[in-house]
C-alpha cells in the first residue's frame, strides 16, 4: 500500500495549476523558499551534489536547488503537480528530473544514491511519516544530508497555522492542514533516531505579520526544520 492519503493528493492536485503563481495559494511556499534554500545550502553546499526532493510538488525548491548547481531529482505522487513542474522546468531552462514514484519505492530501487535528500512541508500530509524518514535514510549516501520541515503540534501551532493562516489571514486555503498530523520535534527526533540518522541542526521559522516576511528563529513552536546526517 502506498504511504499516501488520496484526499491529500487530490487537494494538491486540484491546485496544481497555481504552483508558480507567487500571489496565489502557494504564496507562503514562495516566501519560505529563499530561507530554506539558504539554510540547506549552508549545511550541504549544493553545487555539484546529487539531490533528491521528496514531495516536490510543482518544483519550487527543486528548481532553486538546481539553480545553485545541484543535480536534482524531484518525486511526487501528484500527476498534475509533476506536469506543472515539468512545464515550468522547460520554460525556465533549469534542468530537474521529475518522476511519479513513492519515496519507499525509490528507496528500494536506488539505495544510497543521493548526497542530499530534502523532504519539506510533506511529512504532515502522509499517514506514516516514520516510513518516509526511513526511506530518506536509505536513499542518502553515508555521510550525506537529510533535511525535513514540518509543523509542531500544540495550541500555538493550531492557532497560527490553522486558524490564523487558513481562516483569518487566508494565507492558505481552508483545509490545507490536518492538525492531528502535525509532528512535535521530539516525535520527529524519535523517527530520525529509529532510522539511524543523526540530528545536526534544528531551526524554527517565524512569520512577522508587520513585515510580512518569514525568518529563521530558535522558536520551533510552529514551523521548524531539521537537518540530519547519515553516518559513514
Swiss-Prot record:
* SUPFAM superfamilies referenced in this protein's UniProt entry, alphabetically: S-adenosyl-L-methionine-dependent methyltransferases (SSF53335)
User: What residues does S-adenosyl-L-methionine bind to?
Assistant: 36, 55, 76, 120
The lineage's top-level taxon is Bacteria
Query: Which InterPro entries does the annotation name?
Result: SAM-dependent_MTases_sf (IPR029063), UbiG_MeTrfase (IPR010233)
Instruction: Enumerate the catalysed reactions.
Output: a 3-demethylubiquinol + S-adenosyl-L-methionine = a ubiquinol + S-adenosyl-L-homocysteine + H(+); a 3-(all-trans-polyprenyl)benzene-1,2-diol + S-adenosyl-L-methionine = a 2-methoxy-6-(all-trans-polyprenyl)phenol + S-adenosyl-L-homocysteine + H(+)
- Entry EC number(s): 2.1.1.222, 2.1.1.64
- GO biological process: any one? methylation
State the pathway, as annotated in the record: Cofactor biosynthesis; ubiquinone biosynthesis
Which GO terms of the molecular function aspect are on file?
2-polyprenyl-6-hydroxyphenol methylase activity; 3-demethylubiquinol 3-O-methyltransferase activity; polyprenyldihydroxybenzoate methyltransferase activity
Q: What does this protein do?
A: O-methyltransferase that catalyzes the 2 O-methylation steps in the ubiquinone biosynthetic pathway.
User: What is the similarity comment for this entry?
Assistant: Belongs to the methyltransferase superfamily. UbiG/COQ3 family.
Task: List the HAMAP family.
Answer: UbiG
Name under which the protein is recorded:
Ubiquinone biosynthesis O-methyltransferase
Q: State the encoding gene.
A: ubiG
Amino acid at each position: 500500500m502506498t504511504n499516501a492519503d488520496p484526499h491529500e493528493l487530490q487537494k494538491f492536485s486540484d491546485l496544481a495549476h497555481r504552483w508558480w503563481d507567487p500571489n496565489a495559494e502557494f504564496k507562503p511556499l514562495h516566501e519560505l523558499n529563499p530561507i530554506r534554500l539558504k539554510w540547506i545550502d549552508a549545511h550541504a553546499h549544493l553545487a555539484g551534489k546529487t539531490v533528491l526532493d521528496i514531495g516536490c510538488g510543482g518544483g519550487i525548491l527543486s528548481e532553486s536547488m538546481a539553480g545553485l548547481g545541484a543535480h536534482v531529482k524531484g518525486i511526487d505522487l501528484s500527476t498534475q503537480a509533476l506536469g506543472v513542474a515539468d512545464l515550468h522546468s522547460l520554460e525556465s531552462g533549469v534542468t530537474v528530473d521529475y518522476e511519479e514514484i513513492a519515496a519507499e519505492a525509490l528507496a528500494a530501487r536506488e539505495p544510497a544514491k543521493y548526497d542530499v535528500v530534502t523532504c519539506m512541508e510533506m511529512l504532515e500530509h502522509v499517514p506514516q511519516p516514520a516510513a518516509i524518514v526511513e526511506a530518506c535514510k536509505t536513499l542518502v549516501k553515508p555521510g550525506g544530508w537529510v533535511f525535513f520541515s514540518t509543523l509542531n503540534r500544540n495550541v500555538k501551532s493550531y492557532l497560527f497555522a490553522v486558524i490564523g493562516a487558513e481562516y483569518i489571514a487566508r494565507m492558505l486555503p481552508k483545509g490545507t492542514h490536518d492538525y492531528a498530523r502535525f509532528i512535535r520535534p521530539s516525535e520527529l527526533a524519535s523517527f530520525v533516531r529509529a532510522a539511524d540518522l543523526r540530528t545536526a541542526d534544528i531551526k524554527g521559522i517565524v512569520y512577522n505579520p508587520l513585515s510580512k516576511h518569514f525568518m529563521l528563529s530558535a522558536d520551533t513552536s510552529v514551523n521548524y526544520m531539521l537537518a540530519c546526517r547519515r553516518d559513514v
